[in-house]
């Protein structure tokens, strides 16, 4: 969905930039659902690729794989549509249009060398594509990954890089003037998984005997994506939207097995923990009155809205 020039958007607007279909729900599902449910808030999701190189967990759909029929990207558009419907998100776009940049695959795989992939994208062009969305929607808040892409996936890293560039470029009147009037985003957040959450997961899988997504690690200190709890600036706790997050996860059936670790982890460490999502504010000012060691509870905290 693209907003027309006549569209009057709500006063609070947040832009989420994710790499592939399904990423939107894993780290930001309850956050997106909770804001999408508010009449005063507009949620925009930009997905950078179709996820063409992802795995296929449904046996009867195995021929969709990139090394076989190479039809997975188109199929995942439908999965993403269903996920957004579960989350209540009505404004979703693909960066540069569907299929402009291809899934780059995991690091150090042949897919990284495909000239069509996001990892090889010209940063000016990719930023211009995101700037066009920013200047149209005029979000006060942007949410994406950290500079390591959370767990090092090339597309997550590139989504971060593009977002950082667009954060600056959107406010620059000399950059892509054809993309609309300059707009300054007020707050830039990066998704984060607290060490305490990772440690709880490690201990759960060790005690239950299940296959751990954290491998043989005994401590969250050994997991690169685990962020020290004291660095977390913001926590969105939205228990009532956990069912929407779970339903959105199930919409991505080629990627998430119903007996997979995401659902096992939710059962193991407690659903309330799974309904909390965490962020680090890296650009902009924290909301006033946030005591040392305390978290913001609203991405818009401190903004004059």
From Swiss-Prot:
- InterPro entries the record matches: GlcNAc_PI_deacetylase-related, LmbE-like_dom_sf, Mycothiol_biosynthesis_MshB
Q: Which residues of the sequence carry a binding annotation for Zn(2+)?
A: 20, 23, 156
Entry's cofactor comment: Binds 1 zinc ion per subunit.
Under which EC number(s) is this enzyme classified? 3.5.1.103
Cofactor(s) recorded for this entry are: Zn(2+)
**Residue numbers spanned by region Disordered:** 284-305
* Pfam families documented for this protein: PIG-L
Alphabetized, the UniProt keywords read:
Hydrolase, Metal-binding, Zinc
The molecular function terms in GO held by this entry are: N-acetylglucosaminylinositol deacetylase activity; zinc ion binding
A Gene Ontology biological process noted in the UniProt record is: mycothiol biosynthetic process
Which chain positions lie within coiled-coil regions?
A: none
Q: Which reaction does it catalyse?
A: 1D-myo-inositol 2-acetamido-2-deoxy-alpha-D-glucopyranoside + H2O = 1D-myo-inositol 2-amino-2-deoxy-alpha-D-glucopyranoside + acetate
- Residue ranges annotated as compositionally biased, kind Basic and acidic residues, are 284-298
Name the domain of life this protein comes from.
Bacteria
User: Per its UniProt record, what NCBIfam families does this chain match?
Assistant: mycothiol_MshB
What is the recorded function of this protein according to its Swiss-Prot or TrEMBL entry? Answer: Catalyzes the deacetylation of 1D-myo-inositol 2-acetamido-2-deoxy-alpha-D-glucopyranoside (GlcNAc-Ins) in the mycothiol biosynthesis pathway.
Family assignment from sequence similarity: Belongs to the MshB deacetylase family.
What is this protein's record name?
A: 1D-myo-inositol 2-acetamido-2-deoxy-alpha-D-glucopyranoside deacetylase
Q: Which organism is it from?
A: Parafrankia sp. (strain EAN1pec)
This protein's gene is called mshB
């Amino acid at each position: 969905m693209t907003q027309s020039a006549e569209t009057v958007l709500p006063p609070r607007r947040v832009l989420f930039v994710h790499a592939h279909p399904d990423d939107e729900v894993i780290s930001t599902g309850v956050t997106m659902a909770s804001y999408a449910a508010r009449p005063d808030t507009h949620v925009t999701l930009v997905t950078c690729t179709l996820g063409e190189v992802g795995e296929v967990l449904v046996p009867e759909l195995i021929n969709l794989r990139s090394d076989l029929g190479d039809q997975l990207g188109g199929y995942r558009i439908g999965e993403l549509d269903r996920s957004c419907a579960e989350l209540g998100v009505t404004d979703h776009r693909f960066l540069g249009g569907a299929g402009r940049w291809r899934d780059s695959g995991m690091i150090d795989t042949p897919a990284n060398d495909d000239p069509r992939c996001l990892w090889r994208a010209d940063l000016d062009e990719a930023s211009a594509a995101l700037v066009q969305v920013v200047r149209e929607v005029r979000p006060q808040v942007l949410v994406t990954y950290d500079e390591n892409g959370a767990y090092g996936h090339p597309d997550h890293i590139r989504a971060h890089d593009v977002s950082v560039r667009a954060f600056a470029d959107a406010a620059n009147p000399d950059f892509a003037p054809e993309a609309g009037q300059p707009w300054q985003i007020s707050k830039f957040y990066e998704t984060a998984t607290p060490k305490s959450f990772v440690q709880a997961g490690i201990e759960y899988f060790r005690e239950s005997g299940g296959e751990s997504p954290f491998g043989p690690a005994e401590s969250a200190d050994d997991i690169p994506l685990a962020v020290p709890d004291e660095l977390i600036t913001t926590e969105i706790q939205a228990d009532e939207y956990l069912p929407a997050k779970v339903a959105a996860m199930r919409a991505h059936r080629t990627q998430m097995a119903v007996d997979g670790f995401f659902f096992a982890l939710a059962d193991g460490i407690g659903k309330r923990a799974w309904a909390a999502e965490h962020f680090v504010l890296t650009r902009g000012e924290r909301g006033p009155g946030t005591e040392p060691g305390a978290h913001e509870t609203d991405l818009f905290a401190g903004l004059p809205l």
